[in-house]
Curated annotation (Swiss-Prot):
The modification N-acetylalanine is found at A2. This is Ubiquitin carboxyl-terminal hydrolase 15. Residues 260-904 form the USP domain. The active site is at C269, H862. It comes from Rattus norvegicus. Hydrolase that removes conjugated ubiquitin from target proteins and regulates various pathways such as the TGF-beta receptor signaling, NF-kappa-B and RNF41/NRDP1-PRKN pathways. Acts as a key regulator of TGF-beta receptor signaling pathway, but the precise mechanism is still unclear: according to a report, acts by promoting deubiquitination of monoubiquitinated R-SMADs (SMAD1, SMAD2 and/or SMAD3), thereby alleviating inhibition of R-SMADs and promoting activation of TGF-beta target genes. SUPFAM superfamilies: Cysteine proteinases (SSF54001), DUSP-like (SSF143791), EPT/RTPC-like (SSF55205), Ubiquitin-like (SSF54236). Residues 627-644, 931-945 have a biased composition (Acidic residues). The keyword Metal-binding does not apply. The gene is Usp15. It is an enzyme of class 3 (hydrolase). It is found in: Cytoplasm; Nucleus; Mitochondrion.
């Protein structure tokens, strides 16, 4: 059996490994476990082959399940934002969770983080654990200021919510009541389908729900039909509101078409921003407003959405351009998107560009004029002229893809791959719907670290260091050395978690392995580890001993405080080692007073033989260690007396040399007054090396200890444990002083604002030759192997509307970051001709028509949009339901994320699109002048732009 009567480690490992493979089933409950705790458990049970040597090592015993790293401070059930599966937490089914809790218990004061499995997708169903719950605000109709917040699963029903509200506000079951959705403009919507789920009802994060109780006379406070409901399709008692749009102030006809906001359904600003940009793309909007989409709906395309996305989008666009509403609530559109793209089904913040990509692809497939796609064998260039290969590629593309989306948004680029081994050149031409442009990356990042100096009286100092993003631990030490004066080669960098060393880094390890939430401690060690053979660096952890209960003599221990590193002589006496350890902790270990000394001897534990202690306080080789032993306490045993401090106050082997006091360091001599007076030891110590208590030490009359270099390694799994009796710890160990630290002025440092970059710089970076990464190689048909080839992209032809995605977000296993670089992009006359390699391409000039903005950091923040109205040619700012005028000087900002450019020869009045030609012909026949949002002199560029079109 393992600790505390738990199953043996082989059984634990086998059971959990099997349960981790459990398939998700709708309605099942799964539990979140902090990945750091789980990794510690895996080490303890030897889950992975490389951890087998630690199996059963009591010094890596994980202790109670600790999920505090997943929770917001002060909230036992609220998760931190943007947690990532496998990186921050792992998911366990109910049976697995119950087993772990029975074996290890749950940290006191914590509650299980239980989540339901929900089903997503309309046609292709798949299950997903709903990690983030929907937070709803609940109140009574008679007192809407008294709001109570509760969290629900999307799988919970309206009936479940009503029962919870009744419980909160003490409303008896027999009392007739009804629920309402309350929106921001004081509009209400009935919730009268008790079996509907939160997901089906479209309830979103932060939604206010109101319960209304029936009056004694049989009437309702809000009346038989709510007068404040502003829904043109509203009716009672049928529950149709889930499928309809909510409109503000219906019946008005004095709103300018297109100047219509979109209500935020709860973290749906990303969707609103994308829709506003597409809505203000003139050729696409005219296509839908003139019902041209109806004759091109493709209901049978297996890659499409049966026309549902196109129809839902068309309905929304018609409402936005009707001129009747100042804003609409796009719930029906949101529901359709969520059904076909489950990643957008919830109410968590998403990426605007990812939604745009899905929407453009969905509209394309729903409106694809090709009813049966032919199979086409793709060909490599094989030395043929670019013009021939490009025309072939575009023709092949049109044989399978022909829609209004292709007409407006698709272009063609050339991709060239060169094998580094055989020099094989592969050239292909591929269509694109938008350009994702890289931004010049920040080459540096800031890290906050704590420097622990060798002087035991010095508090740890917090520093902010600037290090290369693609660097190693030595770069961190070099930067810290410049601020602190401590030589980089005298530093050891560690990651401390849960009172133990989680990692001890080598100098050549990558900085990318350090995450933002890691607690990085750098220790000053005054020896040269490569040359000094007389000393050894050992990690030291602190443990508090305890008994499992008053009914048993079994003892255990738990980690506390901050671990530390220290250099000690390789050959030492037990007494000198004890004094060195006590000296290292003299800042926060209080010494006894004369009164305390005469009160009686200090007892460092109730029994010197706990955990197999020998008479000298050193654990015997091979003895049990950290958590528990089967040996009973011997209440009559007495501790051995610590030799007089005077006998050991001058240690020839103490690290630091004779000049420590001159250098301001605390030494045994300068701290003698602090150390004197103890007749009994405050703690005992035990060695642990890679899971075994087998570090060689020589036990003779002088009680010498020898650290064997063949066995001892500087590693987070090798350490010296200092075991404290609870009473002595409480009496002499000052935990507040131990946790205290100082801040260096660098912590307040804010990096200077970066200069802007031009959009053309990003385009040049996009077309720059690069070497493929090791994780993304190219298969060379000549070598018959995957190679890290060089790759170059070039633009061949550009579409009428060019969508430019600025790649502000970067992801890696250890880091998530947003680049806030200011990109200077032109409002008009963006000349792309210099980037086209097609020799027949003439000048291609574009004007900006819309911008999607993102404010805030990685994974959160807020989306808005700037857009130019096609009817009056003026700029407007769209912020969810709010629409306001904007000026051109507001548009270029660090928030710009997705840019929409329209080629000058395709604007209304040029007759470029068939619909525009029809409108132009009708205008000529009636004698009505044609309005254009471009000056007449822009037509001078028409001939120049003709050659910019596709080579089909």
């Amino acid at each position: 059996m393992a600790e505390g009567g738990a199953a043996d480690l082989d059984t634990q490992r086998s059971d959990i490994a099997t349960l981790l493979k459990t398939s998700l089933r709708k309605g099942d409950t799964w539990y979140l476990v902090d990945s750091r705790w789980f990794k510690q458990w895996k080490k303890y049970v030897g889950f992975d082959s490389w951890d087998k040597y630690q199996m059963g090592d009591q010094n890596v015993y994980p202790g109670p399940i600790d999920n505090s790293g997943l929770l917001k401070d002060g909230d036992a059930q609220s998760l931190k934002e943007h947690l990532i599966d496998e990186l921050d937490y792992i998911l366990l089914p109910t049976e697995g969770w119950n087993k772990l809790v029975s074996w290890y218990t749950l940290m006191e004061g914590q509650e299980p983080i239980a989540r339901k499995v929900v089903e997503q997708g309309m046609f292709v169903k798949h299950c997903k654990v709903e990690v983030y719950l929907t937070e709803l605000k609940l109140c009574e109709n008679g007192n809407m200021n008294n709001v109570v917040t509760r969290r629900f699963s999307k799988a919970d029903t309206i009936d479940t919510i009503e029962k919870e509200i009744r419980k909160i506000f003490n409303i008896p079951d027999e009392k007739e009541a009804r629920l309402w959705n309350k929106y921001m403009s004081n509009t209400f919507e009935p919730l009268n389908k008790p079996d509907s789920t939160i997901q089906d009802a479209g309830l979103y994060q932060g939604q206010v729900l109101v319960i209304e109780q029936k009056n004694e006379d049989g009437t309702w406070p809000r009346g038989p039909s709510a007068p404040n409901v502003k829904n043109s399709n509203y009716c009672l008692p049928s529950y149709t509101a889930y499928k309809n749009y909510d409109y503000s102030e219906p019946g008005r006809n004095n709103e300018q078409p297109g100047l219509c906001g979109l209500s935020n359904l709860g973290n749906t600003c990303f969707m609103n921003s994308a829709i506003q940009c597409l809505s203000n793309t003139p050729p696409l909007t005219e296509y839908f407003l003139n019902d041209k989409y109806q004759e091109e709906l493709n209901f049978d395309n297996p890659l499409g959405m049966r026309g549902e996305i196109a129809k839902s989008y068309a309905e929304l666009i018609k409402q936005m351009w009707s001129g009747k509403f100042s804003y609409v609530t796009p719930r029906a559109f949101k529901t359709q998107v969520g059904r076909f793209a489950p990643q957008f089904s919830g109410y968590q913040q998403q990426d605007c560009q990812e939604l745009l990509a899905f929407l453009l692809d969905g509209l394309h497939e729903d409106l694809n004029r090709i009813r049966k796609k032919p199979y086409i064998q793709l060909k490599d260039a094989d030395g043929r002229p670019d013009k021939v290969v490009a025309e072939e590629a575009w023709e092949n593309h049109l044989k399978r893809n022909d829609s209004i989306i292709v007409d407006i948004f698709h272009g063609l680029f050339k991709s060239t791959l060169v094998c580094p081994e055989c020099a094989k050149i592969s050239v292909t031409f591929d269509p694109f719907c938008y350009l994702t442009l890289p931004l010049p990356m920040k080459k540096e990042r800031s890290l906050e670290v704590y420097l622990v100096r060798m002087d035991p009286l010095a508090k740890p100092m917090q520093y902010k260091v600037i290090v290369p993003k693609i660097g190693n631990i030595l770069d961190l030490c070099t930067a810290l050395s410049a601020l602190s004066g401590v030589p980089a080669d005298k530093m050891i960098v560690t990651d401390i978690y849960n009172h133990r060393f989680h990692r001890i880094f080598a100098m050549d390890e990558n900085l990318s392995s350090i995450m933002e939430r890691d607690d990085i401690y750098v220790f000053e060690i005054n020896i040269n580890r490569t040359e000094d053979t007389e000393h050894v660096v050992i990690p030291v952890c602190l443990r508090e001993k305890f008994r499992h209960s008053s009914y048993t003599h079994h003892t255990g221990s738990s980690l506390f405080g901050q671990p530390f590193l220290m250099a000690v002589p390789r050959n030492n006496t037990e007494d000198k080692l004890y004094n060195l350890l006590l000296l290292r902790m003299c800042r926060y270990v209080k010494m006894s007073t004369e009164t305390e000394e005469t009160d009686g001897p200090l007892r460092c534990c109730e029994d010197q033989n706990i955990n197999g202690n020998g008479p000298n306080g050193i654990h015997e080789e091979g003895s049990p260690s950290e958590m528990e032993t089967d040996e009973p306490d011997d209440e009559s045993s007495q501790d051995q007396e610590l030799p007089s401090e005077n006998e050991n106050s001058q240690s020839e082997d103490s690290v630091g040399g004779d000049n420590d006091s001159e250098n301001g360091l605390c030494t045994e001599e300068t701290c003698k007054g602090r150390l004197t007076g103890h007749k009994k030891r405050l703690f005992t110590f035990q060695f642990n090396n890679l899971g075994n208590t087998d570090i060689n030490y020589i036990k003779d009359d002088t009680r010498h200890i020898r650290f064997d270099d063949r066995q001892l390694r500087l590693d987070e799994r090798s350490f010296l444990a200092l075991d404290w009796d609870p009473d002595l710890k409480k009496r002499y160990f000052d935990e507040n002083a131990a946790e205290d630290f100082e801040k260096h002025e660098s912590v307040e440092y804010k990096p200077p604002k970066r200069p802007f970059v031009k959009l053309k710089d990003c385009i040049e970076l996009f077309t720059t030759k690069e070497k493929l990464g090791a994780e993304d190689p190219w298969y060379c048909p000549n070598c018959k192997e995957h190679q890290q080839a060089t790759k170059k992209l070039d633009l061949w032809s550009l579409p009428p509307v060019l969508v430019v995605h600025l790649k502000r977000f970067s992801y890696s296993r250890y880091m998530r970051d947003k680049l806030d670089t200011l990109v200077d992009f032109p409002i008009s006359d963006l000349d792309m001709s210099e980037f086209l390699i097609n020799p027949n391409a003439g000048p291609c000039r574009y004007n900006l028509i819309a911008v999607s903005n993102h404010y805030g950091g990685m994974g959160g923040g807020h989306y808005t949009a700037f857009a130019k109205n096609k009817d009056d040619g003026k700029w407007y700012y769209f912020d969810d339901s709010s629409v306001s005028s904007a000026s051109e000087d507001q548009i270029v900002s660090k928030a710009a994320y997705v840019l929409f450019y329209q080629r000058q020869d395709t604007f209304s009045g040029t007759g470029f699109f068939p619909l525009d030609r029809e409108t132009k012909g009708a205008s000529a026949a009636t004698g009505v002048p044609l309005e254009s949002d471009e000056d007449s002199n822009d037509n001078d560029n028409d001939l120049e732009n003709e050659n910019c079109m596709h080579t089909n």
